[in-house]
């Protein structure tokens, strides 16, 4: 197991070094396990002075999250900059008349993306994403919010893989044990919103996309429907231009 996990760590490190190609890394950290893992790998893969990490709390951020951010600073040796987004979000809410928690949650995610890309412009950096494979396949991310980035180093890892690698790389235990939450509104937890835990989700996704079992029961259909409904999040905008021109010169 150690050899396998070390191989995963080294391949992600190589990917980051190659794709950053000397540029700075800009990353948003939430005190959750995914961003903590990516920051930990970055801290071992490139010089720490090239890493610009941002914690963007709001009124829903729990006191324990601030403690975990300090622990993450200690374990990685990377300074994490704090920018409170509540006043920015309130400006959007008052201007647009937003009174739905899900719409407001998407605004919060997109405000964080704006801050990251502003700093990427300022610092000659690339935004490093933190979406895992489980979230990616079911579309559990905000389009042009936390889904907006230049590199996705852990998108090939299921949530269970993330936990395993985080433990191997000694991410703070309080972060690993924490109940997953996007923190987009009060008392929001991933597994409550999704209707099942990540362990079950990972098992079903592996059956559907790797073992090709097909839909075996209602739980499988529920997960497959999440995948179908979120396909637009995984595609580039439709265009009348031939796709060859997007990538070839």
Swiss-Prot record:
EC category: ligase
Catalysed reactions listed for this entry: deamido-NAD(+) + NH4(+) + ATP = AMP + diphosphate + NAD(+) + H(+)
Binding site for ATP: 130, 159, 181
InterPro entries: NAD/GMP_synthase, NAD_synthase, NH(3)-dep_NAD(+)_synth, Rossmann-like_a/b/a_fold
Keyword Cytoplasm appears in the UniProt entry: no
Pfam families: NAD_synthase
GO CC entries: cytoplasm
Sequence positions that bind deamido-NAD(+): 110, 143, 150, 232-233
Superkingdom per UniProt: Archaea
Keywords of the record: ATP-binding, Ligase, Magnesium, Metal-binding, NAD, Nucleotide-binding
Residues that, per the record, bind Mg(2+): 34, 135
Pathway: Cofactor biosynthesis; NAD(+) biosynthesis; NAD(+) from deamido-NAD(+) (ammonia route): step 1/1
Annotated GO MF terms: ATP binding; glutaminase activity; metal ion binding; NAD+ synthase (glutamine-hydrolyzing) activity; NAD+ synthase activity
GO process terms (BP): NAD biosynthetic process
EC id: 6.3.1.5
Subunit-level organization: Homodimer.
Role of this protein: Catalyzes the ATP-dependent amidation of deamido-NAD to form NAD. Uses ammonia as a nitrogen source.
HAMAP family tied to this protein: NadE_ammonia_dep (MF_00193)
Family of this protein: Belongs to the NAD synthetase family.
PANTHER family associated with the record: GLUTAMINE-DEPENDENT NAD(+) SYNTHETASE, NH 3 /GLUTAMINE-DEPENDENT NAD + SYNTHETASE
Protein name: NH(3)-dependent NAD(+) synthetase
Organism for this UniProt entry: Picrophilus torridus (strain ATCC 700027 / DSM 9790 / JCM 10055 / NBRC 100828 / KAW 2/3)
């Amino acid at each position: 197991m150690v050899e396998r996990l070390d191989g995963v760590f080294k391949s992600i490190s190589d990917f980051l070094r190659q794709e950053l190609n000397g540029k700075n890394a800009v990353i948003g950290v939430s005190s959750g396990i995914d961003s903590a893992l990516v920051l930990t790998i970055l801290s071992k893969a490139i010089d720490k002075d090239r890493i610009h990490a941002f914690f963007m709390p709001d009124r829903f951020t729990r006191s324990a999250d601030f403690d975990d951010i300090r622990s993450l600073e200690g374990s990685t040796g990377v300074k994490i900059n704090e920018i409170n987004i509540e006043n920015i979000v309130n400006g959007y809410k008052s201007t647009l008349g937003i009174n739905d928690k899900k719409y407001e949650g998407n605004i919060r995610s997109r405000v964080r993306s704006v801050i990251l890309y502003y700093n990427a412009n300022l610092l000659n950096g690339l935004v490093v994403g933190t979406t895992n494979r489980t979230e990616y396949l079911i579309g559990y991310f905000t389009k042009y919010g936390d889904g907006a980035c230049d590199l996705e180093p852990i998108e090939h890892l299921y949530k269970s893989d993330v936990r395993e690698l985080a433990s191997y790389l000694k991410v703070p235990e309080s972060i690993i044990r924490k109940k997953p939450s996007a923190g987009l509104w009060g008392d929001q937890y991933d597994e409550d919103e999704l209707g099942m835990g990540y362990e079950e989700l990972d098992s079903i996704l592996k059956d559907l996309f790797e073992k090709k079992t097909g839909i075996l029961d209602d739980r499988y259909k529920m997960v497959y429907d999440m995948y179908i409904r979120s396909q637009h999040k995984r595609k580039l905008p439709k265009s009348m231009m031939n796709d060859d021109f997007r990538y070839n010169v």
